[in-house]
Amino acid sequence: GGRKGDARRMSLTPIRVLCVGAGHMGRSHALAYHKLPGFQIVGLVTRSADSRAKLNAELGGGYAEYGDFHAALKATKPDAVSISSYPDTHAEYAVAALAAGCHVFVEKPLAVTVAEAEQIVAKAKEVKRKVVIGYILRHHPAWTQFIKTVQTLGKPLVMRMNLNQQSSGDNWKTHRALMQTCSPIVDCGVHYVDIMCLMTGSR
């Protein structure tokens, strides 16, 4: 009975999550952690005080706010870190979180260079922690069906990707800032390269 009781208590213990980033995806993930049972947000991290305050207010205003990731990581000691900040911060934050003993969810792209991505993978293996990347299309019903259908059509000989995202107003400011940290093919194109790999069974 003792072991079963311990397992039950462990299952009821919420996963303590530090949420990094308060943009579109950061907000989406924070809302999910806020609403889902089994998770407890221990802090909201973003460089913009206005963005932090706005997100915190949307979540009820009860969460600690931090402008510095490393200070937040040290202060909150989370079980997991959810990284939805600009791509050029992903490797630094992910490696630091893993080194602190945390599991990591990181929005795509994992990193802006192959070397940085390999550094994250190596650290995760070293400390035996999980890293999950936000490849949402892998789990989207329409895309999973599309992949299955394509695989019945025979061997693909040519694959072409055309990604056209309209941007204006405040969205353009965000997208322009993103393009200063990495190219669109790395930022968004990774979704479709990943799908191509799944279609062909190469990954």
Where do the PLM segments sit?
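N-terminal Rossmann-like dinucleotide-binding module
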Residues: R8-G60
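Beta-loop-alpha module in the N-terminal Rossmann-like domain of NAD(P)-dependent dehydrogenases
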Residues: H29, G61-K123
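Acidic-histidine catalytic/liganding microenvironments
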Residues: L36, L59, A75, H140, ...
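Short, well-ordered coil/turn segments that N-cap beta-strands
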Residues: F39, Y63, C102, R129-K130, ...
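Short, Asp-centered acidic motifs that coordinate Mg2+ and/or phosphate
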Residues: G43, A80, V158
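Rossmann-like NAD(P)(H) cofactor-binding subdomain of soluble oxidoreductases
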Residues: T89, P109, V132-H139
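Rossmann-fold dehydrogenase core element
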Residues: Q119-I136, G154-M161
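Predominantly a Rossmann-like dinucleotide-binding segment in NAD(P)-dependent oxidoreductases
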Residues: L137-R203
